[in-house]
């Protein structure tokens, strides 16, 4: 993630420095605190409905959106840190959320290298990583539902409330997709909001790991292939990288699609839903 120019409130900057110092960062009273941009973000987003990311002394402090569910976030952190799942994820520096000065939930992470726009995406490793994630069943019974349907629901609600635009056709399409996607033929442990910006690695030449477990949980594994599938269907992702990703996923035993043949029956609904979510997000920004 890149840094963006932003005026950071003093209380937040001091909080970030303290958190960084408490979690291995060499942060002093005047150590620089930077705001990090989300994928596609060009300017600061003061809206407390959005997550905010700050970096200081090798530590990333994520202040979650206002109203985030404490118990659900705690459960998701527990899931990604347990032995069956920890090998897939960049691990938090603190295993439970804390509170920022304004009362918003906060999680603490190491700053890792992310995929640069001019770097070739690791399609083979991504396919293998997702397949192995989807084949893993973490221990315990407290595994939450993935946040994919909730995110689709928020997109539909936003489109329904949007003034002056005749978007009822898009709302109806979203509702139809949501109805179909509530009854998945298979479930697995999924990331829930997978895109190339959700990959990070602690060392420049090391393996890639997943970032951002805010939507992870039990869900249809096809959701984690939905974005690249949608890009490929729209002609935005060439055949070669899509084929590499799909073949690697299948070779590693990924359950989202059949081991051979046309995968589109399984990928079409979540790919359409991912496109609708992206459209709503574009209108919102």
Task: Pin down the residues of each PLM region.
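All-alpha amphipathic helical-bundle segments outside canonical DNA-binding/catalytic cores
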Residues: 257-271
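A glycine-centered beta->alpha junction motif in the catalytic cores
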Residues: 102-119, 153-161, 272-285
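A cross-family kinase active-site recognition segment
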Residues: 113-168, 185-187, 218
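Active-site activation/catalytic loop segments of kinase-like enzymes and analogous catalytic loops
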Residues: 222-255, 273-285
């Amino acid at each position: 993630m890149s840094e963006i120019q932003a005026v950071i409130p003093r209380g937040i900057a001091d909080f970030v420095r303290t958190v960084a110092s408490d979690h291995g960062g060499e942060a002093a009273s005047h150590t620089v605190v930077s705001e990090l941009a989300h994928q596609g973000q060009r300017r600061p987003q003061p809206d407390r409905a959005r997550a905010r990311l700050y970096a200081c002394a090798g530590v990333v402090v994520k202040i979650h959106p206002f109203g985030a569910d404490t118990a659900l976030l705690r459960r998701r952190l527990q899931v990604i840190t347990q032995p069956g799942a920890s090998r897939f994820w960049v691990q938090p520096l603190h295993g439970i959320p804390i509170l920022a000065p304004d009362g918003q939930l906060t999680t603490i992470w190491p700053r890792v290298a992310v995929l640069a726009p001019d770097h070739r995406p690791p399609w083979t490793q991504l396919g293998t990583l997702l397949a192995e994630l989807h084949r893993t069943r973490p221990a315990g019974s407290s595994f939450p539902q993935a946040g994919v349907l909730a995110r689709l629901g928020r997109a539909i609600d936003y489109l329904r409330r949007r003034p002056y635009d005749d978007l009822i056709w898009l709302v109806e399409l979203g509702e139809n997709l949501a109805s179909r996607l509530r009854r998945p033929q298979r479930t697995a442990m999924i990331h829930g909001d997978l895109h190339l910006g959700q990959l990070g690695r602690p060392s420049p030449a090391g393996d890639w790991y997943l970032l951002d477990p805010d939507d992870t949980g039990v869900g249809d594994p096809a959701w984690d292939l939905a974005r690249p599938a949608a890009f490929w269907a729209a002609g935005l992702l060439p055949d070669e990288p899509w084929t590499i990703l799909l073949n690697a996923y299948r070779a590693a035993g990924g359950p989202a699609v059949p081991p051979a043949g046309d995968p589109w029956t399984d990928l079409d609904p979540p790919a359409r839903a991912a496109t609708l979510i992206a459209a709503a997000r574009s209108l919102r920004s």
